[in-house]
From Swiss-Prot:
Coiled-coil portions: none
InterPro entries: LeuE-type
Transport in keyword set: yes
Pfam families: LysE (PF01810)
Family: Belongs to the Rht family.
Gene designation: leuE
Ranges that cross the membrane: 28-48, 50-70, 101-121, 132-152, 167-187
Keywords, ordered alphabetically: Amino-acid transport, Antiport, Cell inner membrane, Cell membrane, Membrane, Transmembrane, Transmembrane helix, Transport
GO CC term, one of those recorded: plasma membrane
Functional summary from the UniProt entry: Exporter of leucine.
Origin: domain of life: Bacteria
Name of the featured protein: Putative leucine efflux protein
Length: 191
């Protein structure tokens, strides 16, 4: 697993909204990844990869969405808003939705799933759906373990950061700037 925008988003939400926020972000990532895996199996992801206009649309949507997330993070940091966990449900719904959109607009994930499944699934074999399902389930389980480690670590860090407001602001600013870097890299990604 290479850390990317999805990983960073899950970690950021586990720090700012606790384990519940982290797991809601992870659920958005899991569902987005499952959709991308299905699209890879169905051939849609290959179509996106081989059609420059479609690839560019997904790529720029992803880059703009990362910039949008970055602007929200930096705005909250500059306004001095408290990023401690809140109990209001609309925040949690927004976390899930943002994670899902972030996952679905990640062309690097599309490229990964297209190239990954081609290596392990013989399209000429009968019942490719079963092979696909086993491989997709394995990937999701590995992702769950990895993201759970980040969520638990993030919740642990939250306890430390709550007493250090300046450190929390610096951390949020760095995460926002990393989203800018991911957006720039995504905008220059080639299919």
């Amino acid at each position: 697993m290479v850390p990317g925008p999805n990983t960073l988003f899950v970690l950021k939400n586990s720090v700012s909204s606790g384990m519940k926020g982290g797991y809601l972000a992870a659920c958005g990532v899991f569902i987005g990844d499952a959709v991308l895996m299905f699209l890879a199996w169905a051939g849609v992801a290959t179509l996106i990869k081989t059609t420059p206009i479609l690839f560019n649309i997904v790529r720029y949507l992803g880059a703009f969405y990362l910039l949008y997330l970055e602007s929200k993070i930096l705005y909250a940091t500059l306004k001095g808003k408290n990023n401690e966990a809140k109990s209001d449900e609309p925040q949690y719904g927004a976390i899930f939705k943002r994670a899902l959109i972030l996952s679905l607009t990640n062309p690097k994930a599309i490229l990964f799933y297209v190239s990954f499944f081609v290596q392990f699934i013989d399209v000429n074999a009968p019942h490719t759906g079963i092979s696909f399902f086993i491989l997709a389930t394995t990937l999701e389980l590995v992702s769950f373990c990895y993201l759970s480690f980040l969520i638990i670590s993030g919740a642990f860090v939250t306890q430390y950061i709550r007493t250090k407001k300046k450190l929390a602001k610096v951390g949020n600013s760095l995460i926002g700037l990393m989203f800018v870097g991911f957006a720039a890299r995504l905008a220059t990604l080639q299919s």
